[in-house]
Amino acid sequence: MASLKEIDSRIKSTSKMKQITKAMNMVSSSKLRRAEKNTKSFRPYMEKMQDAITAVAGSNSTSNHPMLKSRDIKRSGYLVITSDKGLAGAYSTNVLKSLVNDINSKHNDSSEYSLIVLGQQGVDFFKHRGYEIESSLVEVPDQPSFKSIQSIAKHAIDLFSEENIDELTIYYSHYVSVLENKPATKQVLPLSQEDSGQGHGQMSSYEFEPDKESILSVILPQYVESLIYGTILDAKASEHASRMTAMRNASDNATELIDDLSLEYNRARQAAITQQITEIVGGSSALE
C-alpha cells in the first residue's frame, strides 16, 4: 500500500491537473461559440456565390471550363484537415484513418495521388509513415481568416487546373453538434451539378459582359477557394467541440480519481492510527 505522503502528493497533482483541464474546457467552449458564429455568418455569402455560379454556369451547359468537366482519373488530390495541437480526443485520428483506408483501397502506389495537409498532426502522421506530402499549412489560427488559408487553397486549385491532379477531395471532421462530430469527405473538383447548377434564391435575368466564359474563369476559382474555406471553418468548429469534450471528460475523470485517492488516503490514515494504538497498547502491556 502507498504511504500517506505518496497518496497526498497524487491528490495534489491530480487537483492541479483538473484545474488545467477545466480551464482548457472553458477556453475551448469560448472558441467553439466564435467558430459557430463564423460558420453561420459565412453561409449567406456561399449561398449568394452559388446563385451567381448558377446564373452563369447553370444556363451554359456547353461551358468548356475545366473545373466543370470530369476527366479520366489518373491522379487524385486529397486535402486533409487536422489540428495543430493534440488534446482533442480522436478528432485528427478519425479523419486520418478514413483517408488512409481510402488510399489503401483505391491506389497501388504514391504516383496515383497527391496529399495536401492542413495541421501539424497530419504532417507528423504522414511524415512518420513515409508518405510524400505535396504541400502543407500549419499553425492555422483558431478562427482562420480567408487570407490565412488562401495560399494552400489556390495551390490545390492550380494542381487541378494544370492537370497535375484530376479530382480534389477534402477529408475533414464535420461539426454536427457539441456532442457529435464525424469524419466526412467532400469532392470540390471537378464541380458537381449541385455546386454549379442549383441556386438558393429566386433567379433573375442577367446580361453577361464580356461573356460567360470570361466570367467563369474568374468566379469559379474564387468559388472553389470559398468552398475550401467554408470546410475549414466547419472543421475548426469540430476541433473546438472535440477538445472541449475531451477536457470535460478529463476533468470528470480527475474528480473521480481524487475521490478514489481520498478514500484510499482515509483508509491508510485509519490503518496507521490503528497500528499506532495497537503498538501503544502492546507497549503498556509489556511494562506491566
Swiss-Prot record:
Similarity comment: Belongs to the ATPase gamma chain family.
Biological process, per Gene Ontology: proton motive force-driven plasma membrane ATP synthesis
GO molecular function: ATP binding; proton-transporting ATP synthase activity, rotational mechanism
Chief location bin: membrane
Name of the protein in its database record: ATP synthase gamma chain
Topology of this chain in the membrane: Peripheral membrane protein
Function noted in UniProt: Produces ATP from ADP in the presence of a proton gradient across the membrane. The gamma chain is believed to be important in regulating ATPase activity and the flow of protons through the CF(0) complex.
Top-level lineage group: Bacteria
Transmembrane segments: none
Gene3D superfamilies: 3.40.1380.10, ATP synthase, gamma subunit, helix hairpin domain (1.10.287.80)
Self-association state and partner proteins as the record states: F-type ATPases have 2 components, CF(1) - the catalytic core - and CF(0) - the membrane proton channel. CF(1) has five subunits: alpha(3), beta(3), gamma(1), delta(1), epsilon(1). CF(0) has three main subunits: a, b and c.
Keyword entries, A-Z: ATP synthesis, Cell membrane, CF(1), Hydrogen ion transport, Ion transport, Membrane, Transport
Localization: Cell membrane
Disulfide pattern: none
A single GO cellular-component term on record: plasma membrane
InterPro entries: ATP_synth_F1_ATPase_gsu, ATP_synth_F1_gsu
